Amino acid sequence: RRRQRQMCIRDRVNAYKESGFLPEWASPGHRDCMVGNNSASVVADAYIKGLRGYDIETLWEALKHDANSQLPRTASGRVAYEEYNKLGYVPNNIGIGQNVARTLEYAYNDWTIYTLGKKLGKPASEIDIFKQRANNYKNVYDPKYKLMVGRSDKGEFNPSFKGTDWSRDFCEGNSWHWSFCVFHDPQGLIALMGGKKEFNHMMDSVFKMPSRLGMDSRGMIHEMREMQVMNMGQYAHGNQPIQHMVYLYNYSGEPWKAQYWVREIMHKLYTAEADGYCGDEDNGQTSAWYVSVSYTHLRAH
């Protein structure tokens, strides 16, 4: 397994040397699919957890390059990186869809780049910009709704915002799914939403709301129907942006809720039948969630 991981990272070195960019959805090559700059998190995770046997300096240069570039006509690099670097978010009025999702993912990716750079001993003059940009998730938070909301290049939040709308500001989801996507700074997110009590209220609301199909600004996509069939409010485990959410209760002082919802998800949304997955498998992510949770559950007992 270790050798397989090494090969995956080495493949990224080769891809960068041959094409000038790291692949973000290699199926195959630089497929134009999904958002974010998550080669950064893959590389950082591998190195920080002790995996070696590849050219980390080339990858470091690749991460810095891709954070400030875009490969034309594909999702490799960062779409709208100039606006993101200038404004601290991707605006929703420049013809770039999924802008809130991109902002949240880029902020997380910036944190992973900073963390890797720190591990490599890179100077502050080189890495502090990524530490600063890791806070950019705060720039799409609208205190009026206590949710992440699209905003224009003038700084105006979307005036027709609805939290349940699967709008073009998000990727295959709505604001309730994406507003908790601050993987690197849960305490910062909790503070942003008004503290633990208010944060827990927002988390509880995800499960208490009706499983309404948010088709205010787009037509049906299969993820909507899957969420409705799951019947867990606005919790959409069939798609990845929200799969970590229940664990945030561990950071907000109510860990028993995390335990309850993890068990509910395991028992209700996974079966050994032909339709045993509750949505997209997406390169093994949905099954990996179950395997990881099952392992920790067994060890706890």
Where are these regions (language model features)?
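Conserved small/polar residues in nucleotide/adenosyl-binding loops
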Residues: 4-11, 296-301
